[in-house]
Amino acid sequence: YTSGGVANRVYEISTPYLTAELFDIKFAQSADVMYITHPNHEVEKLSRTGHTSWTLADVDFTDGPYLDNNITTTTLNPGSHTVGTGVAVVASATTGINGGSGFLATDVGRLIRFRDGYMKVTARADTTNITVEIIEDLGSATASADFALGSFSDTTGHPTCVTFFEQRLVFAGTTDQPQTLFFSKSGDYENMNENRGGTIADDDAIIYTIASNQVNAIRFMTATRTLIVGTAGGEFTVSGGGTDVAITPTNILIKKQS
């Protein structure tokens, strides 16, 4: 609120959005930070640190979210397991990767959970060969079928909407998972770690897909005493099952309202 609320000057910042995309942008704001979603773009974070100090950057999510774990015999074989860049990863087949298409150019920037750690795709040579940055030690550099591909990517689409609820940042509605909600860890908005394979804690991230008779993409979310989720086919409420019961990975209730 500078200059008595009079707009004596306009501050401009470059964005990745096209004019035709503006009406599909959704956002959630907490103080001087705003998270912005559009299905064609990575989640952006607009931060203000001063009247003329604003930054817009891709959100660098911690460990997730991910699609379901691989259930095929396809393995990934990394050239190293320790944290670092420029690591080659070879897939034994394309089965189980992008519906059998193997790695795609649109997978660059995508996270992959592998064994005990995770990595980010930095380059793609062909359908079975990629280069990655290992962000968390993988535990072993031997081939394994224990992997899961990231949910947010140019291949699968990015979230359609976003809101804050019960100290979590909530995203919803990617192209490939139009009825799915993605809750961050409690109090850690950019951490999407579900603690797969470990002991689940109440504050862990949550992925939940609304079950319905037909696919109805999530269009909006509104946080009240419950989380109201609007889809193309009706509205749902999301809660922990009671007025004062918090949502946890093992305690989440979704009810259709209309």
Show where each model-derived region lies:
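Generic structural motif
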Residues: F23-F27, L56, N251-K255
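Short, surface-exposed terminal/edge motifs of secreted or surface/virion proteins that either
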Residues: P39-D58, I130, P178-S184, E235
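Beta-propeller and closely related beta-pinwheel folds
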Residues: Y17, A148-R168, G173-S258
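Autoprocessing Asn-cyclization modules and mimics
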Residues: N8-E12, R48, S53-F147
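Short, surface-exposed charged micro-motifs
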Residues: D24-K26, K45, K120, C161, ...
